[in-house]
Amino acid sequence: MIDVNKFESMQIGLASPNKIRSWSYGEVKKPETINYRTLKPEKDGLFDERIFGPTKDWSCACGKYKGIRYRGIVCDRCGVEVTSAKVRRERMGHIELAAPVSHIWYFKGIPSRMGLVLDISPRALEEVIYFAAYIVIDAGDTDLEDKQLLTEAEYREKKAKFGNRFEAKMGAEAVKELLEQVDIDKEVHDLKEELKTATGQKRTRAIRRLDILDAFKNSGNKPSWMVMDCIPVIPPDLRPMVQLDGGRFATSDLNDLYRRVINRNNRLKRLLDLNAPRIIVQNEKRMLQEAVDALIDNGRRGRPVVGPGNRPLKSLSHMLKGKQGRFRQNLLGKRVDYSGRSVIDVSPKLKFYQCGVPRPMALELFKPFVMHELVKRGLASNIKNAKRKIDREDDDIWDILEDVIKERPVLLNRAPTLHRLGIQAFEPVLVPGKSIRLHPLACEAYNADFDGDQMAIHVPLSDEAVAESRLLMLAAHHILAPKDGKPIVTPSQDIVLGNYWLTQAERGREGEGMIFDSPAEAAIAYANGDIHYHTRIGLAADSMPEKPWPKGYEHGIFVTTYGKLVFNQIFPKDFFYINDPTQENLTHPVDERYFLQPGEDIHEKLDNMKLGKAFKKGFLSDSIAQIYKDYKVQRTSDFLDDLKELGYTVCTTSGLTIGVEDIPTITDKDDIVAEARKKVDVVSKQYRRGLITDEERHDRVISIWNNCKDIVQNEIAQIHAPRNPITIMADSGARGNISNFTQLAGMRGLMAAPNGGMMEIPVTSNFREGLSVLEMFMSTHGARKGMTDTALKTANSGYLTRRLVDVAQDVIIREEDCGTDRGLTVHAITEGDEMIEPLFDRLVGRYTSKSVYDPETHEVICPADVLMDEDMAHKIVDAGVTEVTIRSVFTCNTQHGVCKKCYGMNLATGDDVEVGEAVGTVAAQSIGEPGTQLTMRNFHNGGVAGAADITQGLPRVQELFEARNPKGRATISEVTGEITSIEEDPAEHTRQITVKGQTDTRTYDVPYTASVAVAEGDHVVRGDKLTLGSIDPKELIRVRDALTTEKYILSEIQKAYRMQGVEIADKHVEVMARQMLQKVRILDPGETDILPGELMDIGEFKARNREVIISGGIPATAQSVILGITKAALETNSFLSAASFQETTRVLTDASIRGKNDPLLGLKENVIIGKIIPAGTGMPVYREMEPKVDVPEDEKKKSVYSIADIEKKLAAADAEKDKGSAD
């Protein structure tokens, strides 16, 4: 076998007939498969052992030679080589065809490759290949033309007239002869000459022909190889035949398709031997052609060949295509051993880096390790006994299992794996039962809950895998989300509820105003029942000397609650004391107002003081982020476990419950509803009198009821009691919100109708009163719509993620610094008056490209080439700076990836990104994972004239990434200048906007309905909107440049996501947008050998031009183009990656004609061939590192060798020995 980790690249090409014969181990002459009685393969058949190798290991077919000692011998009786049966997976056969047959990919694809080479229309070609017309091969001295088509009647007539002075044939042999006649060099030269003058359709056709002919010229493929004289037969174990229980056989469809080819081929041979009439032979040749077409791509032409039950047979092309094809099913999605799956369950006792593995599961997964250990400890005499011991589940195996799983992390994965946190490593802990136990804080990253979710478990085997799992994948390291750098490990539900209740304050609780010397003293008072968690107490600051206190108050007494004191004890000792749930308190000591002034009475102070706020979910998340920033992984992990423990304990002991009495009632609900009904009656009257349209009536009714619900909601908010358990749940962020509360205590309001609108009849009851039957029925529509929307959204979002991953999978951090001098100027993104993304968010984690100066003092706040952390970003924003030039992925010069400086910080760690990080995949996951949170709806304007329908949510994101023409497209100016006039044209129902530029004046016709975004006298720049709506990126790149287009895509994607409350860092969107603008289209090739109209990588384009300029030639010119992500993924340099994405046959057809070479730079292509991916520890930089052992001098003398030393010694000893024997 070839070692996949050794080769650099992989090439694809057309196979010549001789190449096919050289692969083959013999010709398949008969359509038989296996003998129905003996079940042995038939001689010369599709499973022949003489051709494909023995069916049993180390044994010939007749049994004369058995055993590995006869390896390589060919049996003289049955002719079968004695070898491993594995060869039946790699040995090919072939079928010698009685007549040439065209390959359907090259004649039927779009564009038809054969048609372009011969300059014949695909329809004419089809007539020739399928024996409907003759084609003139050599016109001789007659009045016929070369490649002219003749019908049967015309052919006879010309034959009678000219005899043998011309030659015309039909079928694939005619095409083959024509292809052999093509002089590629001459054709290429002629076409290049033609291009100098040609225009329009002629030029387009010439460019397409030149492209194909040039591909043949450069690749060394011969055009005549598109027609086959013999076809390969794939190894039999790849098209197996298996016996089913009832003695029947199940076989791969390929065997049926091969049998048809062989049958027709043999019949044709026989007819040719018999000198059968021409018409019969032609018919048989046509049938052979169709049989080969069906084998290669069934259904591409005409009706597909069907098997039993009218099911189309799966041909070779279908074996590669689609989700169930070879690429996606077996190469990119292999099943692995040492894995299991089970239902998950919560275990609050685990540490953050642990998971519970059921005993029987652990025993099965770690079986080889346990067996090894049993033998090593002498508890079993050999492996077989050890296995028996495990199967019997003897008592002594459990201790060994405990020892074996120590220090061996396992990976847990939950499908769908939407981002890289969907697979994390944990240390296994043996638990009883059959369910996998998960830590409650790990749920957020997995999006797991315990209503029956299942998870898969995997065991890393090699030492390297174990080390990577522990160092890179351990759950305790994954505290920040890669998409925005905020903690993903957020406490929820009980933990939030417990900590909120713990930190609440109450007036007049027992022991209020007691002053304690130390936390221990307060704990005793609590244990004795003298104070409560909610009691406000005084505490001496010097009892916690490690903590930072305000200057001058280090020995003072400050006011807190006992609950907050307990909460603070889980923080690091030298962290600030947290008394207020504010960002200020996380970074500064306690506010001075909490301290008692000398001689001040604590009771008086408490009476005048507002109650401190309790700590909600958001604040807990902020404190996790702050601790991570200050103390890094280990301490944060401990803090999270303490937070969890405290939350659960307090929540359990607090006695928080819900009963129906906790749902308050409001007295005047009926009056509010009656008032709304009156208003609705008024509106209906207006409609009946014809004063308003039906649409207006509907909108007004909806608005009245929404208003009514808001009034009820506000009343409920007013009667919120801070001690009410439901209020506590909603306010703390543990579960529910005010809207749920309104439905319980107020009214449900309007329901969604099945058509997507709103029903005019509201549900006026609430859940406490109970709904009427009609109201219940109306509610079901909304519920169903919610479910269907979610299901559709998941599919759409998943497909978007797949396309994003595919287009960016080869973007890897490849170097430290690309040395670019360009940068991206960023400012806050706004929409009207609304802030979409503040400048601060755009600066954190990025390098400055130029120094940042204070706008007033002009001092340098931040020099160039510095990574901005949060403190620096705050400093810049607080100084009043509105725009900063940063290093950006857009302007990075690195080929096939990005450099560290242009990318900036790795948001998941808060440190510099490392070389080898697969930032493309991370970006795709970060954009795709929140896709399900976006809405599916296109918001319509409710009939308000002027505003175009705007697309939002997921459809808008897809529209941008696919670079489609947007809905509600804005007209943009193509010149920089002034708006001289805006005139209406009533006849045409349009407005005319005139822009006067420096050199020319442009007039734009816009429809009446469009809202004009400019006024007369306004100054506009190229690419500015003249009407409201979305800009078409393809137009923008034509009018402006690539960078402007990239900036537009970035800001629009951010708008789509942030409107829905989803935060994604800019850099992820930048990586995607850059991939869409990687190509240029050649306008004029200059003196390069590039073809006009060709798409090529910017990097390659620059390299080609550099060569020409150095040699003093004229460089090529090109224009930037924007490709949608699907198109960009298919245009990648790797044919393996493109073929495994979509349109497999088209990609492979094109790649083989061009003789493409896949440089294996991305992740997918390496996964496909089974090579280690070139990212992370798979980067060449890391793979070439050698571990260096530092040994003190005196130790060295004690003959401690590294393996390398031993190998050197052995080699030297061998050399000595050889030398001695030579002498």
Swiss-Prot record:
Binds 1 Mg(2+) ion per subunit. Binds 2 Zn(2+) ions per subunit. Keywords: DNA-directed RNA polymerase, Magnesium, Metal-binding, Nucleotidyltransferase, Transcription, Transferase, Zinc. Its cofactor is Mg(2+); Zn(2+). The keyword Manganese does not apply. GO terms for cellular component: DNA-directed RNA polymerase complex. Mg(2+) binds at residues 449, 451, 453. GO terms for molecular function: DNA binding; DNA-directed RNA polymerase activity; magnesium ion binding; zinc ion binding. GO terms for biological process: DNA-templated transcription. It comes from the Bacteria. Zn(2+) 2 binds at residues 818, 892, 899, 902. It catalyses: RNA(n) + a ribonucleoside 5'-triphosphate = RNA(n+1) + diphosphate. Gene3D superfamilies: 1.10.132.30, 1.10.150.390, 1.10.1790.20, 1.10.40.90, 2.40.40.20, 2.40.50.100, RNA polymerase II, clamp domain (4.10.860.120), RNA polymerase Rpb1, domain 3 (1.10.274.100). Zn(2+) 1 binds at residues 60, 62, 75, 78. Its EC number is 2.7.7.6. DNA-dependent RNA polymerase catalyzes the transcription of DNA into RNA using the four ribonucleoside triphosphates as substrates. The RNAP catalytic core consists of 2 alpha, 1 beta, 1 beta' and 1 omega subunit. When a sigma factor is associated with the core the holoenzyme is formed, which can initiate transcription. Belongs to the RNA polymerase beta' chain family. This is DNA-directed RNA polymerase subunit beta'. It comes from Lactobacillus gasseri (strain ATCC 33323 / DSM 20243 / BCRC 14619 / CIP 102991 / JCM 1131 / KCTC 3163 / NCIMB 11718 / NCTC 13722 / AM63).
